[in-house]
């Protein structure tokens, strides 16, 4: 009988540092990486490209069922490929982020993408980045981490990220959007953003990314008994 590949789930709100942590852990452990948020962003982008109504669950489900998405890790960077095109930059805009939160609220859309996400589970292991990885997608994962940070700190990080990419941003507006998104994600009927009962809750507000990575890797290795 073939053993099921282990999974480390990293859940948490937007801007908490999940992406950076997951890439660092995947590199340290030499495991596969799933950015589930990117899948929802890719779906949102595909909907925008194909002029699909973001408010129509019936229209979004077929698109989700046939979504052509894959991840390619190159020199520590994660390329997100949609229909053969690198959309890594395009999916990181605030417009797509807000649209992704909208489409993720639909139960049948989430169900359509669930099987695709679980297919990323392969040996030697998987680092799964998302919002419901430990509660819904991989409830049997041996290691679960919920990475959090204050909304103000997350807005500040997002502002710096956007400015580095040449975007002009208003902090107060960005903070309001993050709070609105948090409220939507935490209170949706299906797969709300909550820590799994057996997850380590790690607050990164006053921690450097190096400290976050060190704490997460130490916890994961203890749980998995990895040297």
From Swiss-Prot:
UniProt GO BP:
nucleobase-containing small molecule interconversion; pyrimidine nucleotide metabolic process
Which superkingdom is the protein from? Bacteria
- Main EC class the enzyme belongs to: transferase
Sorted alphabetically, the keyword list is: ATP-binding, Cytoplasm, Kinase, Nucleotide-binding, Transferase
Q: Where does ATP bind?
A: 12-20
Gene Ontology CC entries for this record: cytosol
Protein known as? Cytidylate kinase
Q: Which organism is it from?
A: Salmonella choleraesuis (strain SC-B67)
**Gene that specifies this protein:** cmk
């Amino acid at each position: 009988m073939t053993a099921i590949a282990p999974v480390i789930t990293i859940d948490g709100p937007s801007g908490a540092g999940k992406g950076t942590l997951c890439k660092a852990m995947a590199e340290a452990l030499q495991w596969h990486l799933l950015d589930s948020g990117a899948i929802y962003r890719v779906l949102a982008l595909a909907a925008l490209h194909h002029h699909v109504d973001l408010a129509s669950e019936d229209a979004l489900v077929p698109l989700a069922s046939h979504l052509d998405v894959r991840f390619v890790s190159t020199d520590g960077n994660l390329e997100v490929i949609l229909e053969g095109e690198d959309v890594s930059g395009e999916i990181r805009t605030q417009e797509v982020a807000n649209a992704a939160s909208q489409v993720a609220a639909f139960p049948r859309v989430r169900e359509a993408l669930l099987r695709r996400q679980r297919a990323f589970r392969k040996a030697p292991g998987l680092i799964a980045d998302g919002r419901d990885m430990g509660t819904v997608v991989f409830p049997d994962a041996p290691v679960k981490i919920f990475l959090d940070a204050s909304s103000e700190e997350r807005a500040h990080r997002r502002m710096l990220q956007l400015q580095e990419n040449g975007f002009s941003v208003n902090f107060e507006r960005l903070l309001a959007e993050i709070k609105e998104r948090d409220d939507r994600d935490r209170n949706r009927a299906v797969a709300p953003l909550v820590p799994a009962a057996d997850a380590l809750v790690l607050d990164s507000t006053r921690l450097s990314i190096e400290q976050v990575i060190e704490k997460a890797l130490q916890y994961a290795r203890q749980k998995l008994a990895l040297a």
